[in-house]
C-alpha cells in the first residue's frame, strides 16, 4: 500500500448544488412496496417465471435488491451480482430481453452494451445518489477545465456522463485500472464518489482530481461507532465497501466490492463478521455461509438519525409486482439515443476488456504483471 498519494487538491470539485435531498429519499421510500405474503409471493414468482420463458427474457439482479428477487433470478437461470458481473452477464446472455433489477444506471449500462436487446426495469424511477449528484453538464464543464487529464468515472453514473469519460470502472476493478493508468504517467479526473476516489488515490498514489459525490448508504457509516462495535466483537472480521468514509475504511479487515466482501465472508475461517455495506448483501452471505454471524455496521452517530439505515431506498423500489408489470406491459423500458449509447459504450467496453485481460493474466496493472 502506498500512503504518499498525490492529489492536486484535498477535495477538488466543490459540492455542486444538487445533493440528494431528503425529499428525494422520502419519495423513494414512499414507493417501496410492502413485502408480499408467502402465498402472493409464490403466485407472482410463478407468473414471472412463465413470462420470462414466454418473452425469452432473463432476470439480472443486484445483491442489494429484495431477497425474493435475488432468489427468483437464480431459480430462473439469471444472475445475482455486483454491477460488473451484471454488465458482463447481460452482454453475454442470449436472451432477447433483459429485466434489470437494480437502479437506473445498471439498466442503462445493459442497454449500452446490448443496444439490440430490450432492457426493462421494475421501476424506472429507481435512481442512485451518485448518479443524481453528478449531472452531465456540470461534470463536463469540470472536465473541460482540465483537458490534459484522463477522465475515469464510476459505473454509478448516467449514460451521458459515461459518454464524457475515457474509462468506466466498478469497485471490482477500479484499483487495477487506476494503477495501470498511473503506470502510464496519466493524471486523472475521478467521479463521482469522493470516498472511493480518495481510497484509490491513497492506495495507488495516482494524481487525481476528485468530484464530490457520495452514496447515501455508505456515506452514513461512522468510524467512531464502528470502532466501538469492533471493540465489542474483537473476534469479528470487518468487511467494508470503499464507498465508505476513510475513518470506516481504515477499520476494515477486507475492503472491496460487494463480490469481494461476499467471497471473504464465505472463504475466511472466522465465524463472525461486521458488514459495512448495504444490508441487502446479507441474504447471499447467510445463504452461502449459514454457520456464520453477520452484524450490521452502525450508520448514525450518537443522537443521530440515518437517511438510509444501510438500505438503499431506490434498490428497495424493485419488487416482484414491478417485474411482472414490466414484462406484461412492455413498459419501463430503457431507451437511449443511438449516438449517446455508442459514445458511452467505448469506455464501458474498455473496462470489460481490461477485466477480461486481468482474468487471463495478460494485462499489466501498474503493480506488476497481473
UniProtKB/Swiss-Prot annotation:
EC top class, as a word: transferase
Enzyme Commission (EC) number: 2.5.1.72
Annotated InterPro entries: NadA, NadA_sf, Quinolinate_synth_A_type1
Protein's UniProt keywords contain NADP: no
Coiled-coil regions listed in the entry: none
Predominant location: cytoplasm
A GO term from the CC aspect: cytosol
Subcellular location: Cytoplasm
Gene Ontology terms for molecular function: 4 iron, 4 sulfur cluster binding; metal ion binding; quinolinate synthetase A activity
Cofactor binding, note field: Binds 1 [4Fe-4S] cluster per subunit.
GO BP, sorted A to Z: 'de novo' NAD biosynthetic process from L-aspartate
Keyword Iron-sulfur in record: yes
Pfam families on file: NadA (PF02445)
Pathway: Cofactor biosynthesis; NAD(+) biosynthesis; quinolinate from iminoaspartate: step 1/1
Superkingdom of origin: Bacteria
Binding site for iminosuccinate: 62, 83, 154-156, 171, 241-243, 258
Residues where [4Fe-4S] cluster binds: 128, 215, 312
Cofactor: [4Fe-4S] cluster
Keywords from the named record: 4Fe-4S, Cytoplasm, Iron, Iron-sulfur, Metal-binding, Pyridine nucleotide biosynthesis, Transferase
NCBIfam families: nadA, PRK09375.1-1, PRK09375.1-2
Family, per entry: Belongs to the quinolinate synthase family. Type 1 subfamily.
Function: Catalyzes the condensation of iminoaspartate with dihydroxyacetone phosphate to form quinolinate.
Name of the protein: Quinolinate synthase
Species assigned in the record: Neisseria meningitidis serogroup C / serotype 2a (strain ATCC 700532 / DSM 15464 / FAM18)
Amino acid at each position: 500500500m502506498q500512503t504518499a498519494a498525490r492529489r492536486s487538491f484535498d477535495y477538488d470539485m466543490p459540492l455542486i448544488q444538487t445533493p440528494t435531498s431528503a425529499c428525494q429519499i422520502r419519495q423513494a421510500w414512499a414507493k417501496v412496496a410492502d413485502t408480499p405474503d408467502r402465498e402472493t409471493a409464490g403466485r407472482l414468482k410463478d407468473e414471472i417465471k412463465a413470462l420470462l420463458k414466454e418473452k425469452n427474457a432473463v432476470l439480472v439482479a443486484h445483491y442489494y435488491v429484495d431477497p425474493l428477487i435475488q432468489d427468483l433470478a437464480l431459480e430462473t437461470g439469471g444472475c445475482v451480482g455486483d454491477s460488473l458481473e451484471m454488465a458482463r452477464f447481460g452482454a453475454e446472455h442470449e436472451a432477447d430481453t433483459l429485466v434489470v433489477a437494480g437502479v437506473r444506471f445498471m439498466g442503462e449500462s445493459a442497454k449500452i452494451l446490448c443496444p439490440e436487446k430490450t432492457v426493462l426495469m421494475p421501476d424506472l424511477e429507481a435512481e442512485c445518489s451518485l448518479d443524481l449528484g453528478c449531472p452531465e453538464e456540470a461534470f463536463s464543464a469540470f472536465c473541460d477545465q482540465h483537458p490534459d487529464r484522463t477522465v475515469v468515472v464510476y459505473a454509478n453514473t448516467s449514460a451521458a456522463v459515461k459518454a464524457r469519460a475515457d474509462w468506466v470502472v466498478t469497485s471490482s476493478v477500479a484499483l487495477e485500472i487506476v494503477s495501470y493508468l498511473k503506470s502510464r504517467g496519466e493524471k486523472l479526473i475521478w467521479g463521482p464518489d469522493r470516498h472511493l476516489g480518495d481510497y484509490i488515490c491513497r492506495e495507488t498514489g495516482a494524481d487525481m482530481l476528485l468530484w464530490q459525490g457520495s452514496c447515501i448508504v455508505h456515506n452514513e457509516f461512522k468510524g467512531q461507532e464502528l470502532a466501538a462495535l469492533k471493540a465489542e466483537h474483537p473476534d469479528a472480521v470487518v468487511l467494508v465497501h470503499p464507498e465508505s468514509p476513510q475513518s470506516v475504511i481504515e477499520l476494515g479487515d477486507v475492503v472491496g466490492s460487494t463480490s469481494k466482501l461476499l467471497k471473504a465472508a464465505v472463504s475466511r475461517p472466522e465465524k463472525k463478521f461486521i458488514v459495512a455495506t448495504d444490508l441487502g448483501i446479507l441474504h447471499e452471505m447467510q445463504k452461502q455461509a449459514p454457520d456464520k454471524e453477520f452484524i450490521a455496521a452502525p450508520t448514525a452517530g450518537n443522537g443521530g438519525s440515518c437517511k438510509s439505515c444501510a438500505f438503499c431506498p431506490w434498490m428497495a423500489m424493485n419488487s416482484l409486482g414491478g417485474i411482472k408489470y414490466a414484462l406484461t406491459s412492455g413498459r419501463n423500458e430503457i431507451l437511449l439515443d443511438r449516438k449517446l449509447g455508442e459514445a458511452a459504450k467505448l469506455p464501458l467496453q474498455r473496462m470489460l476488456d481490461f477485466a477480461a485481460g486481468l482474468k487471463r493474466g495478460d494485462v499489466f496493472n501498474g503493480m506488476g504483471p497481473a
